C-alpha cells in the first residue's frame, strides 16, 4: 500500500479502488446467492432459520429476529439503547464527513459528473449493505462456533465472511473472498493515506507554514510522499499494537463518529449558513475531534476498561457530534463578521447547485 501511494499517487489509488469495487460487488453477489441457495431460495425458510439459529454454537437456539440481543438493557445494561442510537448517529452522519470519500470529488471533471458519481455510489453501496444481511444471518445459521474460533478460543469475527465462503464455495471461493477483503482494506487505507498526505502537504505545509507562497518545484509532492510514508508507518504500528482480536467493524464505527463530530459540522454550516466563518470552522473541527477522541479513550473500551470508565457509552457520537456543531456555532457568533465572505455566499450556492465557476479537474 505504501509503495503505490508514495509512487503512484491518486491515479494508482483510484485504479485500486475501481478494481476493488468490481471484485467486492461480484464476490458479495455470489456469496449472497450461495446463502440463498443453501436455504433453497426461500426467504421464509431463511428467516425461519434465523429465528431458530444456533447463535454462536450455544446449546439453546436464539431468535436473531428479536430486538435487544446486543444493545438491549438486559444484555448491555441501562446505557445499551442510548449506545445504539449513538452508533447509528455516527454511521449515518459520519459517511458525509469521511475525508477519503470527500477527496474523490476532486477527481471528476465537473459538478454534473460529481452528482452522477454520487448516485452510482449510493446505488452500489445500498446494494452491498442489503447483501450484508445475508452474510450475517447466513453465517449465524450455517457456521458453527468451532469454525470461527482463534487459537486461544475466542471468536474471530473478522474472519466470518471468508469462512462462510469456504463452507459454501470451497477453497477457491475462500481464497477469492479473502483476496477481495485484502484489496478492500488496501483501497480504504490508501484513500485515507492519500487524503492525509495531501491535506498536510497542501493545507498545512504550503498554506500555514509557508503562508501560501510558491515553494520549490516538486517540494509539495515530496512532502506529501514523506507524509504518506509516516502515516502508513504509524497505522501499521497501531494495528500491531491492537492485535487481530479487535473487531474491525467496531473500529469503523469509531472512525465514523470522529468524522461526524469534526468534519460534518464544518461541511453543513459552510453550505447552509451565510455567516459561518473561519473561526467557527476551526472551533468546530478542533472541539469535534478532541471531544470524540477523548470520549473514546474514556469509554468502556478505552484506557480505564469497562469497570472504571468515566464515560458509559462505547460510541461517542451522541455527545461529540452536538459538541462539534455547538463549537462551530459559538466560534462564529463570538467573532467578528466577515462581510467579504458573506457577500460570496450567493455565489457559493449557485456553484454548489450548478457547478458554474468551479475549478476543472487536473491530471493526477
Model-based region annotation:
Residues 1-12, 224-233, 257-266, 318-322:
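Transmembrane alpha-helical segments of multi-pass small-molecule transport proteins
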Residues 4-11, 135-146, 173, 231-252, ...:
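Transmembrane helix-loop junctions in multi-pass membrane proteins
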Residues 278-343, 347-364:
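A generic transmembrane alpha-helix motif of multi-pass inner-membrane proteins
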Residues 201-246:
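Loop-to-transmembrane helix boundary motifs in multi-pass membrane proteins
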Residues 24-35, 234, 253-295, 323-335:
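Hydrophobic alpha-helical segments of multi-pass membrane transport proteins
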Residues 22-175, 302-317, 346-363:
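Loop-to-helix junctions at membrane interfaces in multi-pass transport proteins
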Residues 1-21, 103-110, 265-276:
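Membrane-water interface regions at transmembrane-helix termini and the short interhelical loops
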Residues 93-94, 173-206:
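Membrane-helix boundary/coupling elements in multi-pass transport proteins
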Amino acid at each position: 500500500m505504501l509503495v503505490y501511494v508514495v509512487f503512484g499517487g491518486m491515479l494508482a489509488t483510484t485504479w485500486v479502488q475501481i478494481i476493488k469495487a468490481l471484485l467486492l460487488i461480484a464476490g458479495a453477489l455470489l456469496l449472497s446467492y450461495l446463502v440463498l441457495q443453501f436455504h433453497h431460495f426461500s426467504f421464509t425458510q431463511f428467516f425461519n432459520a434465523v429465528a431458530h439459529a444456533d447463535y454462536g454454537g450455544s446449546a439453546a437456539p436464539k431468535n436473531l429476529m428479536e430486538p435487544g440481543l446486543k444493545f438491549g438493557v438486559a444484555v448491555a445494561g441501562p446505557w445499551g439503547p442510548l449506545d445504539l442510537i449513538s452508533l447509528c448517529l455516527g454511521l449515518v452522519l459520519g459517511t458525509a464527513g469521511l475525508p477519503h470519500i470527500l477527496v474523490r470529488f476532486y477527481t471528476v471533471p465537473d459538478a454534473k459528473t460529481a452528482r452522477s458519481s454520487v448516485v452510482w455510489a449510493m446505488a452500489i453501496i445500498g446494494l452491498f449493505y442489503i447483501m450484508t444481511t445475508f452474510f450475517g444471518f447466513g453465517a449465524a445459521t450455517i457456521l458453527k462456533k468451532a469454525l470461527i474460533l482463534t487459537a486461544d478460543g475466542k471468536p474471530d469475527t473478522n474472519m466470518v465472511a471468508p469462512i462462510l465462503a469456504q463452507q459454501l464455495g470451497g477453497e477457491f471461493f475462500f481464497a477469492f473472498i479473502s483476496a477481495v477483503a485484502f484489496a478492500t482494506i488496501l483501497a480504504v487505507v490508501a484513500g485515507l493515506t492519500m487524503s492525509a498526505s495531501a491535506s498536510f502537504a497542501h493545507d498545512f505545509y504550503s498554506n500555514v507554514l509557508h503562508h501560501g507562497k510558491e515553494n520549490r518545484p516538486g517540494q509539495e509532492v515530496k512532502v506529501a510522499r514523506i507524509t504518506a510514508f509516516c502515516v502508513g508507518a504509524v497505522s501499521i504500528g497501531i494495528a500491531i499494537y491492537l492485535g487481530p482480536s479487535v473487531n474491525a467493524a467496531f473500529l469503523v464505527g469509531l472512525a465514523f463518529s470522529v468524522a461526524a463530530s469534526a468534519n460534518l459540522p464544518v461541511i453543513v454550516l459552510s453550505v447552509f449558513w451565510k455567516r459561518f466563518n473561519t473561526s467557527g470552522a476551526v472551533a468546530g473541527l478542533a472541539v469535534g475531534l478532541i471531544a470524540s477522541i477523548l470520549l473514546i479513550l474514556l469509554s468502556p473500551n478505552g484506557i480505564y476498561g469497562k469497570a472504571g470508565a468515566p464515560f458509559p457509552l462505547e460510541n461517542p457520537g451522541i455527545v461529540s457530534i452536538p459538541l462539534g456543531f455547538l463549537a462551530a456555532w459559538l466560534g462564529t457568533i463570538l467573532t467578528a463578521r466577515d462581510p467579504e465572505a458573506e457577500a460570496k455566499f450567493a455565489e457559493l450556492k449557485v456553484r454548489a447547485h450548478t457547478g458554474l465557476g468551479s475549478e476543472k479537474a487536473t491530471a493526477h
